[in-house]
């Protein structure tokens, strides 16, 4: 589970941790329309275009089954790229997938060595992973277990915050 600032973020995560492994990469429709090369890369790495509609329940069910069999899922649970350097709250869907698949969640953050912290050509990049969060932490009574989802969101946000300042690049002048 990663916070995202750029459409290129999945590339760095895949290269830094999962190179050579097949994985499922959830991405919004817009991610697959940015650049033909990125689209090709995401598709080769197991990219799945998710529009957030109810018609995609089969995709979610297939993903849960694949995770139960040991596949890795890369998802950016905020559902959008953040623009101001702030951590956005994760959306609930990720917690439903994690709970039903019974898989641990590994928090992740990406930092760019630029004045505004956004990706730029040839800038330094730091990908930081937190400790795995046990699947039991995301267990739910049902898909609408609001109390469990709130607790999961809080725990993931806190994990992202812990991966912040000690690992971020020192601020630069614009």
What role is predicted for each listed range?
Residues 1-54:
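Catalytic core of membrane glycerolipid acyltransferases/transacylases, capturing the structured
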Residues 58-174:
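Non-catalytic C-terminal accessory region of glycerolipid acyltransferases
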């Amino acid at each position: 589970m990663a916070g995202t600032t750029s459409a290129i973020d999945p590339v760095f995560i895949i290269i830094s941790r999962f190179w050579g492994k097949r994985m499922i990469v959830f991405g919004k429709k817009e991610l697959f329309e940015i650049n033909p090369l990125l689209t090709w890369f995401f598709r080769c790495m197991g990219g799945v275009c998710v529009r957030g509609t109810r018609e995609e329940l089969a995709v979610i069910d297939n993903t849960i089954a694949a995770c139960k069999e040991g596949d890795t899922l890369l998802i950016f649970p905020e559902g959008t790229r953040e623009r101001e350097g702030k951590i956005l709250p994760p959306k609930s869907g990720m917690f439903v997938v994690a709970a039903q698949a019974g898989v641990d969640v590994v928090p992740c953050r990406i930092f760019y060595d630029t004045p505004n912290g956004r990706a730029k050509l040839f800038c330094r990049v730091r990908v930081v992973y937190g400790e795995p969060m046990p699947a039991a932490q995301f267990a739910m009574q049902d898909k609408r277990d609001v109390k469990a989802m709130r607790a999961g969101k809080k725990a993931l946000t806190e994990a992202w915050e812990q991966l912040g300042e000690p690992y971020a690049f020192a601020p630069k002048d614009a």
